[in-house]
Curated annotation (Swiss-Prot):
This is Ubiquinone biosynthesis O-methyltransferase. Pathway: Cofactor biosynthesis; ubiquinone biosynthesis. Keywords: Methyltransferase, S-adenosyl-L-methionine, Transferase, Ubiquinone biosynthesis. O-methyltransferase that catalyzes the 2 O-methylation steps in the ubiquinone biosynthetic pathway. The gene is ubiG. It is an enzyme of class 2 (transferase). CDD domains: AdoMet_MTases. The keyword Nucleotide-binding does not apply. It catalyses: a 3-demethylubiquinol + S-adenosyl-L-methionine = a ubiquinol + S-adenosyl-L-homocysteine + H(+); a 3-(all-trans-polyprenyl)benzene-1,2-diol + S-adenosyl-L-methionine = a 2-methoxy-6-(all-trans-polyprenyl)phenol + S-adenosyl-L-homocysteine + H(+). S-adenosyl-L-methionine binds at R41, G72, D93, M136. It comes from Brucella melitensis biotype 2 (strain ATCC 23457). Belongs to the methyltransferase superfamily. UbiG/COQ3 family.
Length: 248
């Protein structure tokens, strides 16, 4: 069990995302980069989950019977497609405003998703366990990475998976993901990312090891401005994803 007296919530981060919550489902709004990134991360998640659990990726609902947790779910950009693929989905976010937006959009889409305004630590303390934990674009916004990764890892069932997507702590990432995306191109509101809170792949791997999870895959994700699309890459200097499993 994690210790409830401690939390990884950064109040300023929650306030920041709550202010722009109404724009979660606007593909041309503040979350445009996530809308563009979504197809790449969705394809990766579906591919790896189907391979792990011996599911037919071409089936209409290949994730049927699997329990998913989307940590820091925001407006539900990942929860909804996972639910459409048959997964039982819990979406958790510390921002009650984000959760309200997510609930409204799910209802409009006739999707049954269990959205909760809660913290990762509270879920872990309650003994929640999942086949798949999605930890996507969240770890760079928490106040205590080690505690956060400990709590999230505790919720992965034996034989289960955890996906993490984040931004590397490199000068290249500072130039592209912060200066470029926030100040020059203004794709994201200024202050969305803070360089000192970015996380290196080896730091995540160390956190996995402490939690008895085994790293099984890692890859970079790069943006092609000519095609206006994101693609898998060997270059992990800026955006990257890692996948870990808990041995059965």
């Amino acid at each position: 069990m994690t210790e409830t007296a401690r939390t990884t919530i950064d109040a300023s981060e929650i306030e920041h995302f709550s202010r722009i919550a109404a724009q979660w489902w606007d593909p041309q709004g503040k979350f445009r980069p996530l809308h563009k990134f979504n197809p790449t991360r969705l394809a990766y998640i579906k591919e790896k989950v189907c391979a792990k659990f011996n599911r037919d990726p071409n089936a209409p609902r290949p994730l049927e019977g699997l329990r998913f947790l989307d940590i820091g779910c925001g407006g539900g950009l990942l929860c909804e497609p996972m639910a459409r693929l048959g997964a039982t989905v819990i979406g958790a976010d510390a921002s009650a405003t984000n959760i309200e937006v997510a609930k409204i959009h799910a209802a409009q889409s006739s999707l049954d998703i269990d959205y909760r305004a809660t913290t990762t630590e509270a879920l872990a303390d309650a003994g929640e366990k999942f086949d798949v934990v999605l930890n996507m674009e969240v770890v760079e916004h928490v106040s205590d990475v080690d505690l956060f990764m400990s709590a999230t890892s505790a919720m992965v069932k034996p034989g289960g998976l955890m996906f993490v997507a984040t931004i590397n702590r490199t000068l290249k990432a500072y130039g592209l993901a912060i200066i470029g995306a926030e100040y020059v191109l203004r794709w994201l509101p200024r202050g969305t990312h803070q360089y000192e809170k970015l996380v290196r792949p080896e730091e995540l791997e160390a956190a996995f090891s402490k939690a008895d999870l085994r790293l099984i895959d890692k890859l970079g994700v790069t943006y092609n401005p000519l095609a206006d699309s994101w693609n898998r890459s060997r270059d992990m200097d800026v955006n990257y994803m890692v996948l870990a499993e808990r041995p059965a």
